[in-house]
């Protein structure tokens, strides 16, 4: 048991040596250790603050990116709607123009047909009149000598004219 209970002299020198070591450490060792711990703590705190700021900036940048993406999609939709409306307007305008041009062409064709018809009728009437005059001249030359036949022909022509007028 003597090993477990130290001598008083040994105890004294252990306390003195421990006190000297403690004084030396407290004067030279602990301040360096405490300073290193405080520097490490400051470095860690600074790193945490920098990381927090970086996370905030990243979140802000992500929010801006999402906002810009939403704006771009909105602009894209607006441009697509505008392009669709423009396409519809152009198609409608082209359709109206085509219908208008078709009506103009139909009217022009109708007018030309009418003119050609009137011209043909005039030509036919002119031909009929010329033929009638030629036939009348031949008939008149033949019958000019016979008074009775001439009178009958005049009466017959007058009757035909009066019937056609009624």
UniProtKB/Swiss-Prot annotation:
InterPro entries: ATP_synth_B-like_membr_sf, ATP_synth_b/b'su_bac/chlpt, ATP_synth_F0_bsu_bac, ATP_synthase_B_chain. The chain crosses the membrane at residues 10-30. CDD domains: ATP-synt_Fo_b. The keyword Transmembrane applies. It comes from the Bacteria. Keywords: ATP synthesis, Cell inner membrane, Cell membrane, CF(0), Hydrogen ion transport, Ion transport, Membrane, Transmembrane, Transmembrane helix, Transport. It is found in: Cell inner membrane. It is a single-pass membrane protein. GO terms for molecular function: proton-transporting ATP synthase activity, rotational mechanism; proton-transporting ATPase activity, rotational mechanism. The keyword Transmembrane helix applies. GO terms for cellular component: plasma membrane; proton-transporting ATP synthase complex. Belongs to the ATPase B chain family. F-type ATPases have 2 components, F(1) - the catalytic core - and F(0) - the membrane proton channel. F(1) has five subunits: alpha(3), beta(3), gamma(1), delta(1), epsilon(1). F(0) has three main subunits: a(1), b(2) and c(10-14). The alpha and beta chains form an alternating ring which encloses part of the gamma chain. F(1) is attached to F(0) by a central stalk formed by the gamma and epsilon chains, while a peripheral stalk is formed by the delta and b chains. F(1)F(0) ATP synthase produces ATP from ADP in the presence of a proton or sodium gradient. F-type ATPases consist of two structural domains, F(1) containing the extramembraneous catalytic core and F(0) containing the membrane proton channel, linked together by a central stalk and a peripheral stalk. During catalysis, ATP synthesis in the catalytic domain of F(1) is coupled via a rotary mechanism of the central stalk subunits to proton translocation. Component of the F(0) channel, it forms part of the peripheral stalk, linking F(1) to F(0). This is ATP synthase subunit b. It comes from Parabacteroides distasonis (strain ATCC 8503 / DSM 20701 / CIP 104284 / JCM 5825 / NCTC 11152). The gene is atpF.
């Amino acid at each position: 048991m003597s090993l477990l209970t130290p001598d008083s002299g040994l105890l004294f020198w252990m306390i003195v040596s421990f006190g000297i070591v403690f004084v030396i450490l407290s004067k030279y060792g602990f301040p360096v250790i405490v300073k290193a711990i405080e520097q490490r703590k400051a470095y860690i705190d600074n790193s945490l603050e920098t990381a927090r700021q970086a996370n905030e900036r990243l979140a802000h940048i992500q929010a801006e990116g999402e906002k810009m993406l939403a704006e771009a999609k909105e602009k894209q939709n607006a441009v697509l709607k505008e392009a669709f409306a423009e396409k519809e307007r152009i198609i409608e305008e082209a359709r109206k123009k085509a219908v208008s041009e078709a009506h103009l062409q139909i009217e022009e064709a109708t007018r030309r047909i009418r003119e050609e018809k009137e011209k043909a009728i005039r030509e036919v009437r002119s031909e009929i009149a010329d033929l009638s005059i030629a036939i009348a001249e031949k008939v008149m030359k033949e019958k000019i000598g016979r008074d009775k036949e001439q009178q009958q022909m005049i009466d017959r022509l007058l009757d035909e004219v009066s019937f056609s007028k009624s």
